[in-house]
Regions:
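Alpha-helical cap/lid subdomain in secreted, periplasmic
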Residues: 1-137
């Protein structure tokens, strides 16, 4: 089972700041994520926790900084509960060392095909998927 949550929780703090009831605070986020982990972990073979992400390379950007807070919660809980951490933000940050974020998401939240492929590759790398042993079509 994989859990990736928090992106809209952060986004709502910036796209509808006048409606605070729409926002999920870091404390609420941690409580909710902890509850999901505790209700799931003993029922599955492996539990993957994925960091929320914001496709913005500038860590000083207010929304990126807030997303990093939520990602830190995921990292901490992943370690605490022994879950497999899939760090989507780190994967995107590696991409941003070479390309602009607009290449993978016009709004910095919803990935296009390239962005989704980066996510898939990052997730599969934590599942033991070996790209060197792909079946060859005959």
């Amino acid at each position: 089972v994989s859990i990736c949550t928090g992106i809209n929780d952060v986004w709502r703090q910036f796209d509808v700041p006048g409606i605070p009831s729409e926002a999920c605070t870091p404390d609420e986020y941690e409580h909710n994520l902890r509850e999901m982990i505790e209700r799931t972990r003993d029922k599955v073979l492996r539990l993957f926790l994925a960091t929320p992400y914001f496709m913005e390379p500038c860590r000083a950007d207010r929304m990126r900084a807030r997303m990093d807070e939520y990602s830190d919660i995921v990292r901490r809980l992943s370690s605490e509960y022994g879950c497999e951490l899939v760090d989507f933000q780190a994967a995107y940050d590696r991409f941003f060392e070479h390309k602009h974020s607009a290449i993978i998401a016009w709004d910095r939240v919803h990935p296009n095909q390239i962005g989704a492929t980066l996510m898939a590759r990052e997730f599969l790398s934590h599942c033991g998927f070996d790209y060197g042993h792909m079946p060859v079509e005959k």
